[in-house]
């Protein structure tokens, strides 16, 4: 926590091809070792694969996938009288997109396809169809929150 006042959020610039800040954030999540060009190539090639396979606009598919992956509730550990409770809390909109993008990238990295482009494209298409590991993660998060609903009054 800063001592000199609130931290201002840095805004990302929209990407040059799709003119979308979400795409830039996805590129930033994909990027390893500062290699933005490599991350951009991976994403744009994945979008080409999506366009080829579905015949739909890849941006629409991506936005639908992200909507299906973003969690509404999550649990946060809260210590009360020597016991730790998993307290369900609502996820703020900014964190929703951050978690959605993070899960999509992480689970696409763990997939079995040959190239990262194929993995990312398949994970996005799976998420758009409400299947895939990232959607399962969201479902598990919601289940945890539902199971711990009894501790909701410990919210702060």
Swiss-Prot record:
Keyword RNA-binding among record annotations: yes
GO CC terms in record: small ribosomal subunit
Keywords: Ribonucleoprotein, Ribosomal protein, RNA-binding, rRNA-binding, tRNA-binding
GO molecular function, one term: tRNA binding
GO biological process: translation
Pfam family of the protein (one): Ribosomal_S7
PROSITE patterns referenced in this protein's UniProt entry, alphabetically: RIBOSOMAL_S7
InterPro entries linked to this entry: Ribosomal_uS7, Ribosomal_uS7_bac/org-type, Ribosomal_uS7_CS, Ribosomal_uS7_dom, Ribosomal_uS7_dom_sf
Gene3D superfamilies with a match to the protein in the record: Ribosomal protein S7 domain
Family: Belongs to the universal ribosomal protein uS7 family.
Quaternary structure and partners: Part of the 30S ribosomal subunit. Contacts proteins S9 and S11.
Function: One of the primary rRNA binding proteins, it binds directly to 16S rRNA where it nucleates assembly of the head domain of the 30S subunit. Is located at the subunit interface close to the decoding center, probably blocks exit of the E-site tRNA.
Protein known as: Small ribosomal subunit protein uS7
Origin species: Brevibacillus brevis (strain 47 / JCM 6285 / NBRC 100599)
